């Protein structure tokens, strides 16, 4: 069980068998999430790590405005954290807490996946969480219509490439992007569809 006040969103495995996780905000204020304005930059959470012998601990230097997607480098030394309400991805040294780089993107970044080419892949929301909720959360819909973009980011230097920008037609509100071979596959907030775009 995750102890209060942690409110976990995304997780990523560490080489030693532990894992890191994004703590978005304290549970007691979680109901305010849909009232927040995009890119408000109000810091509410951070990244934590868990080990069987030590339990939960905060990773210093990871405070951010609604930390969402999180990944860790293959050697476990670097944490990559998407700050949903400050429209950026940040790389942090896991041991020292020092920021290695931070990169602004268009929209609010969601979950991160490491592609088979080693790049960081994620979608960003170009509509507010309130709009996403009103359009498709908890509703029986074929697909969500929220506009989104898809990014690839170089983990070494934070250089971003916007791969795709949608208008939400036929598939929208993407929450995950996974590169496999020549394609990037997309998940969504709701509906019964997955998306696919060509890989770079």
Segments (PLM) and residue ranges:
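Short, conserved, GDST-rich strand-edge loop motifs in beta-rich repeat architectures
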Residues: 21-42, 123-145
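Residue position within the beta-strands of beta-propeller blades
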Residues: 20-22, 81, 121-123, 186-187
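Residue-level signature of beta-propeller blades and closely related beta-rich strand-turn architectures
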Residues: 25-26, 85, 126, 190, ...
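Short loop/turn segments that connect beta-strands within beta-propeller blades
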Residues: 50-54, 93-97, 154-158, 198-200
């Amino acid at each position: 069980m995750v102890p209060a006040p942690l409110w976990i969103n995304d997780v990523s495995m560490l080489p030693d068998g532990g894992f890191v996780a994004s703590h978005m905000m304290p549970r007691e204020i979680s109901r305010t999430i849909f009232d927040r304005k995009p890119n408000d930059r109000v810091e509410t959470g951070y990244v934590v790590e868990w080990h069987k012998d030590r339990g939960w601990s905060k990773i210093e230097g990871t405070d951010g405005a609604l930390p969402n997607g999180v990944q860790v480098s293959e050697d476990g030394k670097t944490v990559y954290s998407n700050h949903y309400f400050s429209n950026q991805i940040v790389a942090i040294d896991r041991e020292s807490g020092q920021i290695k780089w931070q990169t602004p993107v268009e929209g609010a970044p969601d979950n991160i996946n490491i592609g088979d080419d080693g790049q960081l892949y994620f979608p960003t929301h170009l509509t507010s969480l309130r709009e996403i909720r009103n359009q498709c959360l908890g509703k029986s819909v074929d697909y969500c219509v929220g506009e989104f973009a898809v990014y690839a980011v170089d983990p070494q230097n934070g250089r971003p490439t916007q791969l795709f920008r949608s208008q939400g037609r036929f598939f929208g509100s993407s929450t995950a992007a996974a590169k496999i071979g020549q394609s990037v596959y997309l998940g969504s907030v709701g509906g019964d569809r997955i998306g696919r775009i060509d890989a770079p």
